[in-house]
């Protein structure tokens, strides 16, 4: 059993709550503000102590590079995201319908969540209405890959094609038109890479 100081327990609980509420970990500055530390450096020291004790894992060089151990996150399984509420992060608790008991490592790269597919725009690659698309959270995307993209409050599954300051989100169904996004005029967020499909 991991033994933590009272302050370390507070930091760990804040990390868990932040991930549950938003889908991603807090920054050092957010931890400092919430717990009344004088600086982000104080939060960093507590995070290093938690990592040394095995309570968290840290990813070097990332402002939100805090992970809960796989044993803790895999107990629930992979979250299934249904209708994405406008203005909420994709893994906000409001969007999670249930959990699937498959381990994230079932997919390569590992799946961070399932997105319940709506519509038939990707049917020609076997992604059908109601399927669960396994998604690996990353913004490192290459042309030709299938991605989960957010345009404003809309979330869509399409094939990614970057052309200078423009992105084409391509369907795999001739009945649907490509979505063209001018990056200088419209925000586009990549919510992850499609890494597999299951049908239940």
Curated annotation (Swiss-Prot):
Keyword Endoplasmic reticulum: no
Family annotation (CDD domains): S24_LexA-like
Matching InterPro entries: LexA, LexA-like, LexA/Signal_pep-like_sf, LexA_DNA-bd_dom, LexA_repressor, Peptidase_S24_LexA, Peptidase_S24_S26A/B/C, WH-like_DNA-bd_sf
UniProt enzyme class: hydrolase
Pfam families: LexA_DNA_bind, Peptidase_S24
Signal peptide positions on this chain: none
Site (Cleavage): 86-87
Active site residues of this protein: 121 (for autocatalytic cleavage activity), 158 (for autocatalytic cleavage activity)
Gene3D superfamilies, A to Z: Umud Fragment, subunit A, Winged helix-like DNA-binding domain superfamily/Winged helix DNA-binding domain
DNA-binding region: 28-48
Catalysis performed (reactions): Hydrolysis of Ala-|-Gly bond in repressor LexA
GO biological process: DNA repair; DNA replication; negative regulation of DNA-templated transcription; proteolysis; SOS response
Alphabetic keyword roster: Autocatalytic cleavage, DNA damage, DNA repair, DNA replication, DNA-binding, Hydrolase, Repressor, SOS response, Transcription, Transcription regulation
Keyword Cytoplasm: no
Enzyme Commission number(s): 3.4.21.88
Single GO molecular function: serine-type endopeptidase activity
Self-association state and partner proteins as the record states: Homodimer.
Family: Belongs to the peptidase S24 family.
NCBIfam families in alphabetical order: lexA
PANTHER family recorded: LEXA REPRESSOR, LEXA REPRESSOR-RELATED
Task of the protein: Represses a number of genes involved in the response to DNA damage (SOS response), including recA and lexA. In the presence of single-stranded DNA, RecA interacts with LexA causing an autocatalytic cleavage which disrupts the DNA-binding part of LexA, leading to derepression of the SOS regulon and eventually DNA repair.
Name of this protein: LexA repressor
């Amino acid at each position: 059993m991991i033994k933590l100081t009272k302050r370390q327990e507070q930091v760990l609980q804040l990390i868990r709550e932040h991930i549950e509420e938003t889908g991603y970990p807090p920054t050092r500055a957010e931890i400092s503000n919430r717990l009344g530390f004088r600086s982000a450096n104080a939060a960093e020291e507590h995070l290093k102590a938690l990592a040394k004790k095995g309570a968290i894992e840290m990813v070097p060089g990332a402002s939100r590079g805090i992970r809960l151990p796989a044993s803790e996150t895999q107990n629930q399984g992979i979250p299934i995201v249904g209708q994405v509420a406008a203005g909420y992060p994709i893994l906000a608790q409001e969007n999670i319908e249930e959990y699937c008991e498959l381990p994230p490592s079932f997919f390569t790269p590992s799946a961070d969540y399932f997105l319940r597919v709506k519509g038939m725009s990707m049917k020609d690659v076997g992604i059908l209405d109601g399927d669960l698309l396994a998604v690996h959270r990353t913004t490192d995307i290459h042309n030709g890959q299938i991605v989960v993209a957010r345009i404003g409050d809309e979330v869509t599954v399409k094939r990614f094609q970057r052309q200078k300051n423009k992105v084409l989100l391509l369907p795999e169904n001739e009945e649907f038109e490509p979505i063209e996004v001018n990056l200088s005029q419209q925000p586009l967020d990549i919510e992850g890479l499609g890494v597999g499909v299951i049908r239940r």
